[in-house]
Amino acid sequence: MKREGVLYIISAPSGAGKTTLCKEIIDIFPHLRHSVSYTTRQPRAGEVHGKDYYFISMDEFRSMVDKGEFAEWAEVHGNCYGTSIRTLEECRITGIDLILDIDIQGARQLKERYEGGVYIFILPPSYEELRRRLNGRSSDSDDVISRRIDAAAGEIRESRWYDYIIVNDQFSRAVEELKSVVVAERCRTFRVLETVTERFDMG
C-alpha cells in the first residue's frame, strides 16, 4: 500500500533564506513538491504565476475564504497568503511529499487541523545578518524592511514549538541539515509500518 504524503511545513522570518532552501531541497528530492500558495501581493522580479505563487486579487482571495477552500490562510505584512485544501488532499492520497513555505500563523492553523506534519523553522545567524540580507533586497522599501525586522523577534520566539530548528548561517550546511530531516521523517515507524506489515506478513 502506498504511504501517505508527508507535509513539511517550513517557516522563518523574512530574510532567513527559507525560499532558497526550499527550492534547493526540491531539486534534490524528485518526489518532493512545492505547495504553491495563493497570495494577494504583487509578484517580485522573476516570480511566475502558478509556479512561485498564484497571484490573485483581494476579492478573489476573500471569495476562496468564504467558500472554505483554504486549509490555512493569514495576512502577513499587509498581504494575504493561503494554502488550498485540494492541494494537500491530492498529495496526501497520491503519496507525494509536500513542502509548505508558510508563515507562523498558517503553520499554527495546520498543526491544529492536520496530524503528522513536520514543522521546521529556519533562523538567520543573527539579527545583524538578517538586516543585511533584507537591505540587499531591491524589491523592498525601507519601510517594509523596518516592519519585517520588527516582526522578526516575535516570529523567532515562536520557533520553540516547531519540531526542528535550522540555522541558515552556511547555506550548504543548512541544506544538509534539511536533507537529513526529510530522510529521517520518511523512515518514521508510523509512516512505514503498514507497508512493512504487509510485506513481511506481520499481521
Swiss-Prot record:
Domain Guanylate kinase-like: 5-183
Cellular compartments per GO CC: cytosol
UniProt-listed SUPFAM superfamilies: P-loop containing nucleoside triphosphate hydrolases
Top-rank lineage group of the source organism: Bacteria
Chief place where the protein resides: cytoplasm
Binding residues for ATP: A12, P13, S14, G15, A16, G17, K18, T19
Location in or out of the cell: Cytoplasm
Entry's Gene Ontology molecular function annotations: ATP binding; guanylate kinase activity
Record EC number: 2.7.4.8
Keywords linked to the UniProt accession: ATP-binding, Cytoplasm, Kinase, Nucleotide-binding, Transferase
Top-tier EC class: transferase
Record's catalysed reaction(s): GMP + ATP = GDP + ADP
InterPro entries membership: GK/Ca_channel_bsu, Guanylate_kin-like_dom, Guanylate_kinase, Guanylate_kinase_CS, P-loop_NTPase
CDD domains to which the protein is assigned, alphabetical: GMPK
Family recorded in the similarity comment: Belongs to the guanylate kinase family.
Reported function: Essential for recycling GMP and indirectly, cGMP.
PANTHER family from the UniProt entry: GUANYLATE KINASE, GUANYLATE KINASE-RELATED
Protein name: Guanylate kinase
